[in-house]
Amino acid sequence: MKILDLSAGNRAIWFDRFYRDTLYVDRRAEVNPTIVADSRALPIETGDAYDLIVFDPPHANLGANGKMSSRYGHHTASEIRSIVEGTAKEAHRVSRHDALMSFKWNNHDQSFKNILELMAPWWEPLFGQKTSERSRRLRSTQWILLRRRS
């Protein structure tokens, strides 16, 4: 199985941070990805047949000088939407016709529903954690598995 991690960072979500069949992408060279690139413009040929896409995008519009910003970078709300939408489109371009995407989101500043709508032309929810109305109002992290649209 070929895996493409489009927001590798420090690989905190990985149990094996150097999984052999994974291409780790990040735009920051200091985190030592396999490829230094913007996930919205990958230097990968179309249809390179990735089976699984891992996408844990930036989700919080934090101050430029905070601890979290120094670790994950500073992004405005519109930049975050651009990253999510552009990466979803690019992931579709380089993935197999039956690929899946493991997607992580925290509704710190933008609702999960609104973010999924940005991805809808290319990816559709298959299953994931359902949330209550109360948890939608709180800052909660969710994982979902998406299926590539044809």
Enumerate the predicted regions with their spans:
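Conserved SAM-binding motif I beta-strand of class I
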Residues: 22-26
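Structural motif
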Residues: 2, 51-52
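Class I S-adenosyl-L-methionine
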Residues: 17-18, 107-150
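Mobile active-site "lid"/loop adjacent to the S-adenosyl-L-methionine
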Residues: 52, 56-87
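Conserved class I S-adenosyl-L-methionine
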Residues: 1-16
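Short strand-turn motif at the edge of the Rossmann-like AdoMet-binding core
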Residues: 57-58, 104-107
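Short glycine-dipeptide loop
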Residues: 84, 88-90, 94-101
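Short conserved loop adjoining the S-adenosyl-L-methionine
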Residues: 34-35, 41-48, 62-64
